[in-house]
Every structure is written in C-alpha cells, then in structure tokens.
Amino acid sequence: IGEKVPAFRREAPAGGFRLAGAQGRKLVIYFYPRDNTPGCTTEALDFTRMKDDFAAAGTTVIGISKDSVKSHDKFCKKHGLGVILVSDEGSDVSERYGVWAEKSMYGKTYMGIDRTTVLVDKSGKVARVWPKVKVAGHADEVLAAAKAL
C-alpha cells in the first residue's frame, strides 16, 4: 500500500490497455482465474452492474486473467459485460502484482491467479488490496472504498 503500481500494456477485446493511460483516475484492477467459470462470471457481472457507480466515483474497472483476447471477447459478448478485460497470457502482469501463485485442486498442484483486487488512487499508488477475494458482496465493498478515496 502506498507503492506505485507496476506499469503494463496489454491487449483487450476493444484494443490495447495501457496502465499509464489511466493516470488521473482511480483504477480497480481485479485479477480472476478464468473466463466463463461461475465465480468469475458473477464477479464480472457484479462489476458490470455497478459500472456507472464506479464511473461516477471517477474509477475505471479492469479485469485481468490468463485468458486470450478472443476468450475475453466471447466472455464479454456472452454475458453483456461492460468492464475492460485484459489478457495476461504470459502471466507476467500477474507475477508483478504478486497474484500468480501455486494452487491445488483434487490433490494436484498448478500455477494460477489468486483472485485479488487492487484499488489504485489517482496518483497511481496502491490504496488498498483485497487478497483471496470472496465474490459475494465484493464489488459493493470495492465501490465504497473507491468513493472514500
């Protein structure tokens, strides 16, 4: 908290996204494991539902996963999503933000994204981090924090 966020430029369905292009605005970066899975879909729909509220609070919302731009495009169209989804296929952005971690399922370990949200202030510094996010009510909590900045 209080540190400058790592800069990045990545592809997104509507074109590229550059972190530097968001300067002067608050930014919510939510890292999620995978498109079209129940928790990830709910989270994206919650942030989409509140998109206008975040905009009124001067805050841009972006989601980041390892999925391809093509996958993000299909995910957005299928669910009518209104948030920017950024592809991190090489996982280097996830690594720089410290959310690329060893996970386990059914006794097997693998590397993946820990569901995490980062709130960035207008100066590009980390204002708050939510690690190991539980989706229910999360977007509401993030909006309240963004409004309070």
Feature annotation, model-predicted:
Residues 1-149:
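Chalcogenol-based redox active-site neighborhoods
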